[in-house]
Every structure is written in C-alpha cells, then in structure tokens.
UniProtKB/Swiss-Prot annotation:
GO CC field: plasma membrane
Protein name stated in the entry: Multidrug resistance protein MdtG
Domain of life: Bacteria
InterPro entries: MFS, MFS_dom, MFS_MdtG_subfamily, MFS_sugar_transport-like, MFS_trans_sf, Mutidrug-R_MdtG, Tet-R_TetA/multi-R_MdtG-like
Family, per entry: Belongs to the major facilitator superfamily. DHA1 family. MdtG (TC 2.A.1.2.20) subfamily.
UniProt xrefs under CDD domains: MFS_MdtG_MDR_like
Membrane topology: Multi-pass membrane protein
Keyword annotations: Cell inner membrane, Cell membrane, Membrane, Transmembrane, Transmembrane helix, Transport
UniProt key word Cell inner membrane: yes
Molecular function via GO: transmembrane transporter activity
Subcellular location: Cell inner membrane
Length: 404
C-alpha cells in the first residue's frame, strides 16, 4: 500500500478545516467595520478622497486574489493542499501584522494587495475536503465547511468593532494576525494529508485540465454561477444601510437595524447549508441549485416593494436560507465533474470567479442606485439571477441529454 492509499480521518480534517475557515472568516471581517477610519488615520482627508481610497483598499484584495488563485491552485495540485493552507495562514498573519504598522495609505494599499496574493485558505480547505470525503457525502461536508467561513464573517465585525472601541484601530490588526497564526498552528498539528508530490513535467496544463473534465461547459457554467452569486450579494451591500434608512425614517438606532438586516442572511445560511447539502446528497445537487436560484429571484423582486425594515429583514432571512444551498451545490457539482488530480486548480478557478463577483457586485449596485434609485437594484439583481437560473438549467439539461 502506497502512502497515498493509507486511510485518513476525513471527519477530523473537516472539523479542523471548519475551525480554520471560521478563524480566517473572522480575521478578514474583524477589520472591515473600521477600514475607512483607518484609511482616514493614515492621512486621507476629504469626502471624495476617503470614498475613493476606501473603495480601492477594499477591492484590491479581491482583484489580486482573483489573479493569484489559479497559480496557488496549480501549486496545490503539485505539492499538496495542506502546505497551501499553511502558506496562506502564515502569509496572511505576517501581512496583517505589517498592516498594523503601516505609516501611509500607499503602504496599506500594497499590503492589502499582498493579502489578496497570499490568501486562499478557504478554497484550499474546500479542495482538501472535496478530495478526501466520500462522494456520497460531498454535499453535506462542503455545506458544513461553508458554515465555518460564514460564522467567522458574522462574528468578525462585531468583535472588530468592540476591540477597536477598547484598544484602538492598530491593535486590532495585531489581534487579527494572532488569530491567523492560531489557524496556522491548528493546520500544522492536526490536519493530515497523504499526498505524493507531482513533478512540474507531470502536471497537466490548462488545455489538458479542460480536456480531463467530464463536462467542460457545465464546469464553466458553475464558475459563472459562483460569479453571479457574489454579484447578487455584493450589489446590495453598498445601498443596504441607505435603503434601511429610507424605510425606517428618522430613528436613532439606524446602525443597529442596518447591522441586523445585513447579518440575517448569514444566520439563515448557517442554519440551512448543512441540511440542504445533505438533501442534495439524496436528491442531487443540481436540483438544489436550480430551485435555490429560482427562490432567490422570487425573494429579490418583493424586496424592491417593501415598506418597513422588518419586511426587508424577513425576506433577507429567507434569501439567506436559499443562498446557503448555492455555493455548496456548486462545489459539489465541481467535485462530481472533476478528478482529485486537478481539484486544486478547479476550486482556485472557482475562487477567481468569486473574487471577480466580489469586485463587480458593489460597483453594479452603486451604479444602478445612482441612476435609478435603491429599489431598482433588487429588480436588476433578480434579473441577473434569473438569467443564471436559465443558463444553469440549460447546462445541466445538456449534460443529462449527453449522458442519455
């Protein structure tokens, strides 16, 4: 029996990677509530300049992550996924530490770009688990894993706000670096992977990767679905607080109401993702994907007609429950339509599309709201998701006809 054939405890790996994704999600979102304040502290003054630099330092991380992800994915397929998890956690910890020492906005911008280049813990965690878990449990495992990052992202802003209030802005970066270093230690000591390194000559090139896919068109449609999921999520983010203020009128606790409405989809996804992932293992992830996309459309449209913040909160909770099924369903279908040999690159390509969606979504939402108002954003987003539902259904139908 070769080393790669030795059984490993994938359930323990799932638990540890869940903790790693939780810590990574929390670490990234810890600094988000006060990012514009830190930009201001670094010497940027004036409303327009502050808006421009805040947008730049936010989006540049996703942009550089989209560029770097395929490279790291290829390296993961050559050297193993565990070493990529270690590289990502340690690299991000060092960059976060340096961010707390930044003296001007250019240093901070470069470090935010470097954070994107060195990131990739969550897609590599997905690739690791996808290659270890039994195929018939992929939906449940990837759905469960997705709740780690969601949980961290939900708790991160709250913890970041509290820490910044007590200790100031710079110490939060040092605390975040410590959290990421803990993630590195957990990965180093507790994650097991049996991986035989592949030489550079043996690694498949992009054309060979595409040729090895069971259904290249379907995989491309899944990448597009990931992009549109993030566009739909991100398009609402820039206008949410302003829309809530328009609905609520003059109330003193608008920040609390907006924060609650912003977080309810994450709570719903946290509850629904493992259950819908398990259901997908039974009835097929493709059915879960199409139904969840259609439900998302049916929930986005009435959001443009709500009259109170609580109506919006209810619809966003239901939308979060549906969205909790989307990315795990996409990831499960990627597992079904690729091999372990190329899993790192497939998940990294998917991450690149996700990052592109993270950049373009807020830009789309801001442009639509500036031209047509807040309510139009929900209608246009619903149209984009509807297009994706039809496109995905057509791709899955072609696959089914090809099999028959």
């Amino acid at each position: 029996m070769s080393p790669s054939d030795v059984p490993i405890n994938w359930k323990r790996n799932l638990t540890v990677t869940w903790l790693g994704c939780f810590l990574t999600g929390a670490a990234f979102s810890l600094v988000m509530p006060f990012l514009p304040l830190y930009v201001e502290q670094l010497g940027v003054t004036g409303h327009s300049a502050l808006n421009m630099w805040s947008g730049l330092v936010f989006s540049i991380t996703f942009l550089f992550s989209a560029i770097a992800s395929p490279f790291w994915g290829g390296l993961a397929d050559r050297k193993g996924r565990k070493i990529m998890l270690l590289r990502s956690a340690l690299g991000m910890a060092i960059v976060m530490l340096l961010m707390g020492m930044a003296q001007n906005i250019w240093q901070f911008l470069i470090l935010r770009a470097l954070l994107g280049l060195l990131g990739g813990f969550i897609p590599n965690a997905n690739a690791l688990i996808a290659t270890q878990v039994p195929r018939h449990k992929s939906g449940w495992a990837l759905g469960t894993l997705s709740t780690g990052g969601v949980s961290g992202a939900l708790l991160g802003p709250l913890a970041g706000g509290l820490l910044a209030g007590h200790y100031g802005l710079r110490p939060v970066f040092f605390i975040t670096a410590s959290v990421l270093f803990i993630c590195f230690l957990l990965t180093f000591f507790f994650i097991r992977e049996n991986f035989l390194p592949v030489s550079k000559k043996e690694i498949l090139h992009v054309r060979e990767v595409v040729a090895s896919l069971k259904n290249p068109r379907l995989v491309l449609s899944l990448f597009v679905t990931t992009l549109i999921i993030q566009v739909a999520t991100g398009s609402i983010a820039p206008i949410l607080t302003l829309y809530v203020r328009e609905l609520a009128g003059n109330v003193s606790n608008i920040a609390f109401i907006s924060g609650m409405i912003a977080s309810v989809p994450g709570v719903a996804a946290l509850l629904s993702a493992p259950r819908l992932g398990k259901l997908g293992d039974r009835i097929g992830p493709e059915k879960i994907l199409i139904v969840a996309l259609i439900i998302s459309v049916l929930l986005l449209i009435p959001m443009s007609f709500v009259q109170t913040p609580w109506q919006l909160a209810l619809l966003r909770f239901l939308l979060g429950a549906a969205d909790g099924a989307l990315l795990p369903a996409v990831q499960t279908l990627l597992v079904y339509n690729s091999t372990n040999q190329i899993a790192g690159r497939i998940f990294s390509y998917n991450q690149s599309f996700r990052d592109i969606g993270n950049v373009t979504g807020p830009l789309m939402g801001a442009a639509i709201s500036a031209s047509y108002g807040f309510r139009a954003v929900f209608c246009v987003t619903a149209g984009v998701v509807l297009f994706n539902a039809i496109y995905s259904w057509n791709s899955l139908r072609r696959r089914r006809l090809a099999i028959e």
